[in-house]
Amino acid sequence: MKNDCLAKFSVPYEPGRLEAVSYDAQGCELGRCTLTTAGQQTQITAGPEQNTVQAGHLCYIRLRYTDEKGITKPLARGNIKVEVDGGTLVGLGNACPYHERSYLDCVADTYYGEALAIVRAGEGDGLTLTADDGMYSTAVTVPVTH
């Protein structure tokens, strides 16, 4: 194998867990990556980057299609509509390099099962984001500090 930092191998598909571990020349572990098969159930999961946000500051909320254990379902795709109470939606989108919607829209298509909402916290005690794609919905509340 050439020393170009790329290892490539084929593995037959089988549900479960696949773990890759890299080692240096002395046998010390350098890194580890795990892929786990998602379950049948699908839901939208909303996870804020931090547990609290200061009034007037930005809160980043990751929206994902997951199974009941929180495993991301990258092949699930949908248009997620976001509503915010106690704050202002300042951006909504995904990491797709050819994203065609405005980031100021309240609806975003998911990319590999994910989207990101950016909310500016208001002056109240908390902000609540509700995400709905017509089949699944979720809400998350983030306490606002002053």
What are these regions (language model features)?
Residues 14-18, 59, 125-127:
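Exposed beta-strand face motif in extracellular beta-rich ectodomains
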Residues 35-56, 146:
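Low-complexity, Pro/Ser/Thr- and charge-rich linker/hinge segments at domain boundaries
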Residues 1-31, 66:
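Long hydrophobic segments that form regular secondary structure
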Residues 21-22, 56-74, 80, 129-130:
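Beta-strand-rich structural segments
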Residues 27-39, 136-145:
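Edge beta-strands of extracellular beta-sandwich domains
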Residues 7-13, 102-123:
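Short, hydrophobic beta-strand segments
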Residues 41-45, 83-99:
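Short aromatic-acidic-glycine turn motif
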